[in-house]
Amino acid sequence: MKKFASKAVAVVMALVMVMGLASFAFAASDTIKVGVLAPLTGAVAQYGNAVNNGVMMYFEELNANGGINGKQVELIVYDEEGDPVKAVTGYNYLMDQGVVAIVGDVTTGPTKAVVAESQADLTPMITASATAEDVTCQLNEDGSVAMVYENMFRSCFIDPFQGSKMAAFAKEQMGAGTAAILYNTGSDYSVGLTKAFEATAAEQGLEVVAVESYADGAVDFQSQLTNIAAKAPDVLFVPDYYSVIALVAQQAQSAGVKATMLGADGWDSVLGVVTDAALLEGAYYCSGYSTEDTREEVQTFVANFKARYDTDPDMFAAQGYDAAMIMAAAIEKAEASGAKAGSDEYRQAIIDALKATDMDCVTGHVTFNEYNNPEKTAAIINITGGAAKYWGNY
């Protein structure tokens, strides 16, 4: 495995110790090392920190209740800054540290960069929020599945599901007749959602009157939004992350766009960065869960998270918590199998247990299909009165 600079090692180890999860007084046989890959700094740090908070809280609760078969879980967290190259460096570092499994990565690009390495090493992984279809499987040019990455799972739903869901919602629930799309050509996430939205829109009879795009990292969308405004669509689908949505919302108003904006789970936390919530009034997006869901699992999680972090948990925190829960349950079964910790047999036992997952989680009941994806309903969120309100599951 590759080594990396001692300064970076010091940063990672400091993170581990600050978390209070690792107890270096334990003998090696008394601990189980689990890695976490997440962007704790950088452009998508809000996602990474939310996921990491959910993961940490679950394992803290688990350790407080005896750990896994009497062993404490030691989390080793690597901040990859949202960079695919740094994510691979982080993966190699975590493997050097002897982790038996990894919760991560958080966004699609870094996760895909790590998959090839983790597949070769048979490292069990679960991502809380990387939604591109080809995170868990390799696709042919026609979009069909060529190969499933047997070691890679996720607790979130996938891009095609979200894009399709929002097109159907626009037609069936909003009564929209026309739609426009503004998407990021440099983002697998954005491109995947766009393709699915277009396909379902065609099936539903929702006419797409304008499709505009921008390069990754763009901050000026005025020209594209002016073109969209001229088409006067009923809805505008913008499948990107919260930092971009905040900019688009502001510029859409000045460009004269009157359409109701629609988005996907990348919008979660957008109200924390937008200059004026009124710019997104009436918008809808799909999410993995809502704090307003009345199920006991949800309300217990929300109460505990708020007590620990003094804020309500967003979707990323909930999916991080679920990813940790699912992985811990699989590790517990591997521990009971008698396989030597860290061996190929042990890793395969974790993977086999992941495939057989059948459990109630915060974001819903989870089983995995043949592509290692959970199939769940989506929570629809409506931004109204400056707040993100739970519309219902759809």
Predicted regions and their residues:
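Intrinsic disorder/low-complexity segments
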Residues: 1-3, 20, 392
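Bacterial N-terminal signal peptides that target proteins for export
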Residues: 1-12
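Bacterial N-terminal signal peptides
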Residues: 12-20
